[in-house]
């Protein structure tokens, strides 16, 4: 399969076609069973996190190390010139791009990753989350996990629960799964946190079935994937947060009518939207999902930075 991802910016999952998604998934599966410790030897990658992160940052950095590359960067944007001296993001990226072979960026501003790509002088940009907009590498690991557990990415019933308005992971995942045939979407959220119109409009245009629901119980017997999200305190005012956070909590009792193949996913961190007892059910898959992030990020890093792959 031709590697059309070589030197490509990974900004939005919508920028990748279905063949490119399949290429990443194939490479992820390969790297999960066969280590490639020298694949990116002598490459230097910048990890630029202007917004707090645990799993995404450490997963990316682990992926970089396991491929044999070196990593530089920061995990707190307030301690660099952009934060302390007022340097623009474009200037920061222009300078960093002269040091490295790729830049991983997380930034609270929507559109920041695409802006960074305009000033990176051809150095590939990997979007690790830009505000409430996109989180493409999370989507790649989500797709990898879904395919591992369901053996397909089509003909699935997918429920997304919680903060669908600000949750960038559900935006990206819906766009990706919309590329595959006969998927149906069940959106469960408070009225104030429904899926953005641009996602709903995209599904309408593709003639993909979707519907809003008020609770998980009414759909649990119909779904293959239950994608839970936390209500994001950092993106809501205190009144809205208090109203929404406790409305959508998954208990083991909710799962009594679940399909045998159901898998529960979550981008993490979990707060209180999944009861701890759910962890011990055969449906809980969120920690395995998080572990898959290393392989998916290894895959996309290697495909963007190395043109030819032999396996």
From Swiss-Prot:
General function of this protein: Catalyzes the condensation of carbamoyl phosphate and aspartate to form carbamoyl aspartate and inorganic phosphate, the committed step in the de novo pyrimidine nucleotide biosynthesis pathway.
Organism (species): Buchnera aphidicola subsp. Schizaphis graminum (strain Sg)
Designated name of the protein: Aspartate carbamoyltransferase catalytic subunit
Alphabetized InterPro entries for the sequence: Asp/Orn_carbamoyltranf_P-bd (IPR006132), Asp/Orn_carbamoylTrfase (IPR006130), Asp/Orn_carbamoylTrfase_sf (IPR036901), Asp_carbamoyltransf (IPR002082), Asp_carbamoyltransf_Asp/Orn-bd (IPR006131)
Residues reported to bind L-aspartate: 85, 168, 230
Biochemical pathway: Pyrimidine metabolism; UMP biosynthesis via de novo pathway; (S)-dihydroorotate from bicarbonate: step 2/3
One cellular component term from this protein's GO annotations in UniProt: cytosol
Binding residue positions for carbamoyl phosphate: 55-56, 106, 135, 138, 268-269
Lineage: Bacteria, Pseudomonadati, Pseudomonadota, Gammaproteobacteria, Enterobacterales
Coiled-coil intervals, chain numbering: none
């Amino acid at each position: 399969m031709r590697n059309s991802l070589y030197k490509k910016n990974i900004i939005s999952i919508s920028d990748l076609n279905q063949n490119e998604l399949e290429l990443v998934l194939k490479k992820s599966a390969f790297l999960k069973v066969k280590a490639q410790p020298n694949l990116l030897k002598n490459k230097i990658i910048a990890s630029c996190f202007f917004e707090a992160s645990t799993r995404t940052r450490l997963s990316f950095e682990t992926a970089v190390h396991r491929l044999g590359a070196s990593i530089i960067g920061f995990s707190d944007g307030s301690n660099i010139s952009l934060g302390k001296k007022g340097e623009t993001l474009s200037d920061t990226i222009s300078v960093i791009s002269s040091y490295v072979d790729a830049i991983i960026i997380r930034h609270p501003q929507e559109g920041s990753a695409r802006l960074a790509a305009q000033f990176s002088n051809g150095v590939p940009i990997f979007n690790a989350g830009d505000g409430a907009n996109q989180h493409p590498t999370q989507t790649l690991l989500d797709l990898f996990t879904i395919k591992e557990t369901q053996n397909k990415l089509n003909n699935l019933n997918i429920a997304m629960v919680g903060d669908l308005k600000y949750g960038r992971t559900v935006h990206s995942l819906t766009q990706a799964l919309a590329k595959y045939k006969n998927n149906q979407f069940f959106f469960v959220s408070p009225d104030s946190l429904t899926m953005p119109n641009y996602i709903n409009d995209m599904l309408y245009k593709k003639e993909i079935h979707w519907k809003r629901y008020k609770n998980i119980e009414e759909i649990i017997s119909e779904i293959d994937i239950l994608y839970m999200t936390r209500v994001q305190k950092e993106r809501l005012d205190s009144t809205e947060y208090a109203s929404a956070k406790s409305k959508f909590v998954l208990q083991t009792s909710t799962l009594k009518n679940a399909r045998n193949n159901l898998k529960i996913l979550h981008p993490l961190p979990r707060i209180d939207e999944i009861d701890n007892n759910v962890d011990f059910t055969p449906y809980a898959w969120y920690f395995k999902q998080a572990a898959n992030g290393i392989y998916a990020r290894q895959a996309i890093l290697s495909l963007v930075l190395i043109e030819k792959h032999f396996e």
